[in-house]
């Protein structure tokens, strides 16, 4: 049975793991969200997430955005190649509804997969 959890093994946890993604990444971006990725040696993708206070002032809004992105990753993890991915949230995402964020991030998952595969 396919698991749709977002367990600890699917997360980037240490600063070193985040830093490695920033060196020569594969990119997929929109005006509001940027995905940076590098191939990993695991049998599954891993994700790290940053939402800066500079762009999203209120904690409840940052948490909402992170929750929507994590949920999208959780549901799409089996369609994403074995990559370490860092999601950077930029200005403008705060005005978006949850459904809009979800639609945008799913489009970016597909774009990232295409760039990695060919």
Swiss-Prot record:
It catalyses: Endonucleolytic cleavage of RNA, removing 5'-extranucleotides from tRNA precursor. The keyword RNA-binding applies. The keyword RNA-binding applies. It is an enzyme of class 3 (hydrolase). PROSITE patterns: RIBONUCLEASE_P. Transmembrane segments: none annotated. Keywords: Endonuclease, Hydrolase, Nuclease, RNA-binding, tRNA processing. One of its GO terms (molecular function) is tRNA binding. Its EC number is 3.1.26.5. RNaseP catalyzes the removal of the 5'-leader sequence from pre-tRNA to produce the mature 5'-terminus. It can also cleave other RNA substrates such as 4.5S RNA. The protein component plays an auxiliary but essential role in vivo by binding to the 5'-leader sequence and broadening the substrate specificity of the ribozyme. Consists of a catalytic RNA component (M1 or rnpB) and a protein subunit. This is Ribonuclease P protein component. It comes from Shewanella baltica (strain OS155 / ATCC BAA-1091).
């Amino acid at each position: 049975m396919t698991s749709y959890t977002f367990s600890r093994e699917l997360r980037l946890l240490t600063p070193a793991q985040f830093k490695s993604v920033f060196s020569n990444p594969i990119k997929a971006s929109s005006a509001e969200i940027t995905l940076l990725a590098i191939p990993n040696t695991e049998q599954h993708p891993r994700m790290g997430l940053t939402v800066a206070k500079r762009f999203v002032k209120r904690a409840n809004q940052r948490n909402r955005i992170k929750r929507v992105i994590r949920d999208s990753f959780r549901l799409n993890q089996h369609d994403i190649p074995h990559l370490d991915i860092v999601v950077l949230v930029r200005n403008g995402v705060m005005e978006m509804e949850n459904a809009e964020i979800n639609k945008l991030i799913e489009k970016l998952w597909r774009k990232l997969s295409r760039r990695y595969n060919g």
